[in-house]
Amino acid sequence: MKRRSLLASLCVLPLASCQGESATVRFKVIASATVNGRPIESSSVMEITYSKVTHSLLGTGGATRLCGEALIFDLDGRGTVYILPVQHPPESSLSQVYEYGMLTTLGVKNGIGSLTEQDFATLRGANGRHSFRLYGTARLPSFVAFNDERDPKTIFEIPPPELDRYFPGVRFKSLDIQITNEPLTEKLRERLPWLKNANDPNIFPRDPRATRRPNSELPLSHMITPARFFGDGSR
């Protein structure tokens, strides 16, 4: 699989001549939980464009563009969780999640860099609501919350199965993808005003430069940046 950033840097021809077939999927991310047994849902509309790159120094490959923002999951007065458009695999850096997860959720077996005509047709013809699946794993996008939403340094990560540990009475149920034509959600910058002009990653906790741990040892709070709250097409 070839990363968009790598391909963009290697395409020496104009963008139009670098791209071949493409497909855009607009979808609603739906988070479901129960609060003292009562079901609740929150959602956010996002969009991914998949493109085949036909002229690059590496030959044929693929590119993606994700538009949208973190899902604001209000827990019926118990607090709020933000579901980021990235994942945090164990002992690793933050990485793309919906770009890969959409493919496996819809049953596309090929990777971003090797999509076929049939794969693009599957993406263009997608419909309905599906349980989110990232490969054959139970991994989900990263869930974060704040001790004080006005202070980004109070961010912390929450394993989805442990929601009730942080918000008593709340149990996470599922994350679904529903194909839609609704407008993209744009609520996050109003909810977290410090994101409007935040370009400095140091608004979040950071190790001192002289003693910085490797990414494999860092908690999410110490590697996240403001851009990670948005897809690369919405930053």
Segments (PLM) and residue ranges:
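Glycine-rich, aromatic-bearing surface loops/beta-hairpins
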Residues: E149-R235
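N-terminal export leaders
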Residues: K2-L7
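N-terminal segment immediately downstream of the Sec signal-peptide cleavage site
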Residues: G20-Y50
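Hydrophobic helical h-region of N-terminal Sec-dependent signal peptides
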Residues: A8-V12
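Structured domain cores in non-transmembrane regions
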Residues: R38-I155
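C-terminal motif of bacterial Sec signal peptides marking the signal peptidase cleavage site
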Residues: A16-S17
